[in-house]
């Protein structure tokens, strides 16, 4: 719902499926699993993406629209991309988190490739999200106060109406 991976019907996997801890060095699958984890992380961070042959292509719609194309064979591991993916899809609203992450990434990747994202980008994403939450809490508290005031007014009017009705019954007896 937060991203569209065109090849998902062919590759029904998530980055988490390849995030496996391998306990010994020189395991031939380590590099392959890291590469797959990274490619899928990029795919699920993006607004839309697809794998065509040996290329991963995608679009990130944020503050600016950014298109990227990565050669699958030459891609280097970047653990920050998985951390961003994991942050988006763990807890909270993935749509809100994806929008914030894409805004920051689209601005940052004006100067570097998406595969070169670093910890500063992740920190910026989290900082922007915290500001977003702070604004939402403020809006929530304002709305809660308005609802409480509305309920208080309704209860008061209901009490006045009940008293008026009781007085009319007394006068009719």
Which residues are covered by each model-predicted region?
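Extended, non-transmembrane interaction/recognition domains
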Residues: 1-116, 120
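Short secondary-structure junctions and interdomain/linker hinges
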Residues: 87-96, 111-112, 136, 158, ...
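A broad "ordered helical/assembly scaffold" signature
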Residues: 101-104, 113-129, 154, 160-162
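Short, charged cytosolic
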Residues: 124-150
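Transmembrane alpha-helical segments and their cytosolic interface motifs
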Residues: 143-173
């Amino acid at each position: 719902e937060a991203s569209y991976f065109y090849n998902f019907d062919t590759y029904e996997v998530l980055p988490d499926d390849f995030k496996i801890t391998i306990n010994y060095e020189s395991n031939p699958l380590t590099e392959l699993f890291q590469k797959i984890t990274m490619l899928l992380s990029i795919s699920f961070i993006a607004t839309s993406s697809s794998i065509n042959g040996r290329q991963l292509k995608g679009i990130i719609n944020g503050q600016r629209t950014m298109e990227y194309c990565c050669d699958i064979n030459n891609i280097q591991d970047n653990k920050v991309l998985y951390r961003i993916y994991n942050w988006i899809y763990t807890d909270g609203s993935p749509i809100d988190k994806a929008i914030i992450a894409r805004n920051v990434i689209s601005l940052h990747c004006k100067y570097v490739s998406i595969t070169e994202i670093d910890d500063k980008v992740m920190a910026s994403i989290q900082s922007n999200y915290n500001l977003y939450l702070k604004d939402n809490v403020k809006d929530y508290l304002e709305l809660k106060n308005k609802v409480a005031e509305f309920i208080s007014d309704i209860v008061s009017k209901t009490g006045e109406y009940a008293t008026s009705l009781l007085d009319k019954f007394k006068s009719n007896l």
